[in-house]
Regions:
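Hydrophobic, aromatic-lined core segments that form the binding pocket/scaffold
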Residues: 42-215
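Short, surface-exposed linear patches
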Residues: 126, 244-245
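Generic N-terminal leader/targeting and pre-domain segments
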Residues: 1-71
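Contiguous N-terminal and early-domain "leader" segments and peripheral loops that mark the onset or edge
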Residues: 2-8, 93-96, 237
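Local cysteine-cluster metal-coordination motifs and their immediate loop/turn environment
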Residues: 220-244
Length: 245
């Protein structure tokens, strides 16, 4: 993706935060997938690939099925949501990350799953954006409509089907999973200097995290990492403050 592409701002933000776009754990080098031959649509994670995802998660964390599912969801949704959060925060350009616009594979044994974006992933922008009118770029009326497009694509058309599939396969609560999503989205927004509240409210995820000075995230739910054979307390965990709910 060259400097005259709508999501160049996302790549710039990733380089600013991580120093690279080519060596992010579980993300395709450069974020985009030029050759989809060995990849599958991410929508398959809620179907045929769900057993693969769950088995990989259990082997990775040596955890009961519901704990492995929680941690797998947390890892996947952080890296999935990050391009959308950075695009919105830095340029008010939202890649529409539906289950068909995102590709995944399990060939690399190091991450749980590797994800990448199709080069022609649709992007929603505001009126007056320099990329308005280009093929694959949808112009929406204002900020509310931009956030609505984010919710439809990322949540309704991608993550809620996966959440439903996970919930049907293992005993894991919806609130636990949505708390991890809210936390991951908040981290992405804060990294880019963007207020968290409006985005989480638009996504229906408000009330799941708090932002505490100096700009840290405190969850109101627990990802269950403390139940691992080698227990872990995450930096944003609600357990130390007994604020889980």
């Amino acid at each position: 993706v060259s400097a005259d592409e709508p999501l160049d701002a996302v790549l710039t933000a990733l380089r600013s935060i991580f120093g690279t776009t080519d060596r992010l754990p579980g993300v395709a080098p450069g974020l985009f997938v030029p050759d989809p031959a060995r990849w599958a649509p991410a929508a398959a994670l809620a179907g045929d690939l769900l057993p693969v995802l769950l088995a990989r998660a259990q082997r990775r964390w040596q955890a009961p099925p519901h704990v492995a599912a929680s941690l797998g969801w947390k890892a996947y949704t952080y890296w999935l949501a990050l391009p959308a959060m950075l695009g919105y925060a830095t340029a008010r350009r939202v890649p529409l990350l539906t289950g068909d616009a995102v590709l995944v594979h399990f060939d690399d044994p190091r991450p749980l799953v590797t994800l990448g974006l199709r080069p022609d992933v649709p992007v929603a922008v505001l009126p007056g954006d320099p990329f308005a009118g280009r093929p694959g770029v949808a112009v929406v009326a204002g900020e509310d409509e931009l956030l609505a497009a984010l919710r439809r694509s990322l949540l309704d058309q991608h993550l809620l089907p996966l959440l439903g599939a996970l919930h049907g396969a293992v005993r894991i609560g919806r609130r636990v999973l949505l708390g991890s999503l809210a936390s991951g989205m908040a981290y992405g927004l804060l990294r880019a200097g963007e207020p968290v509240g409006p985005v989480l409210t638009a996504m229906g995820l408000d009330g799941l995290i708090d932002v505490v000075p100096p700009g840290a995230v405190r969850r109101r739910t627990c990802c269950l990492a403390f139940t691992l054979p080698d227990p872990k307390i995450c930096t944003d965990c609600c357990l130390p403050t007994r604020s889980c709910g």
